[in-house]
Amino acid sequence: GEWVRENILVDEPTCHSCPVACKKEVEVDVEVGGEEHQIRMESLEYEPAFTFGSNSMSDDAEVTAVLIDRCNKYGIDAIESGNMLAMAMEMTEKRQVEDGIDWGDHDAMYEMLRKIAEREGELADTLADGAAGVAKRFDAEDSRLDVKNQTIPAYDPRSMKGMAIGYATSNRGACHLRGYTPAAEILGIPEAVDPADPEGKGELQVTFQDLHAISDSFDICKFNAFAEGIEEYVLQYNGMTGRDVSEEELIEAGKRIYTLERYYNNLVG
C-alpha cells in the first residue's frame, strides 16, 4: 500500500456522496507479455493483489495491476484467476503437468490468463473450470485449496478461526464477504476478539452472516457496513418503507435469506 501511494497512485475518486471514499486510481507503464501497457485503472484491490502477488511469488505491483486489468477486460474473476495460476505453478513445480508455468513468471501469467479466457489447451481449459476439476484431472488434490470449487481468498483460515468457519459454511464457497469476521478478528469491529481462539467463533460467524444478508439486500457496501449495525439498519429500513419492524424481525429476515440460499443449493444438488 505504501509503495502504491508513493509511486503509482494518481487520484482518489469516490462513489457519489460516500463518506468512506475507498476508491483509488493508479497509472502504470510496464512491459508484460512482450507488450507495453499504459493503464489507468482502479487501484490494486487487496484480494487479487494477493493472488497475483505473493501467492504467485511476484513482488511487482505494476505487473499485478496489468494482470487484474486483463481479468477485468476478459470478464473473469481476478481472485479466482490468480489462485488458479498459483495452483498451476505448484503443479508445474511438482511435475504434475506439462507446459505449465513457473513461479513469478509474469509473461507466462499474462499469456495463461488469455488461454484460460479462451479455453485454449488442456491445462487452461481445465483451470477455467476451477480447482476441483483441476485436482481430479491432474491428480493434484494436495494443491487444491477451495470450498465448493471456490478458492480461498487472502484471509488465512489457519490463523482466523471465524473466517475458517465462514469458508466452510458459506453458501457460495470460500467467500470472505458472506460473513466478514476479520472485522472483529483483525479490526476490532464492533469489538476485538482473538483470531486464533476457536471459542465462540461459530456464533460470531452466524451473527456476521445474518447481518451481511441484510446489508447486501440493502445494497450497502462492506466498508460502510463497518460503521453500522442492526440499529442503523432498522432505522434505514423503516425510513425507506414506512414500516415499523424491530431489530429481531430484521435479524430473522437475514436468517431466512441465508437459509433460503442453502435450501436452493440443496435443491439443485
Segments (PLM) and residue ranges:
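Extended C-terminal regions of large enzymes
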Residues: 1-269
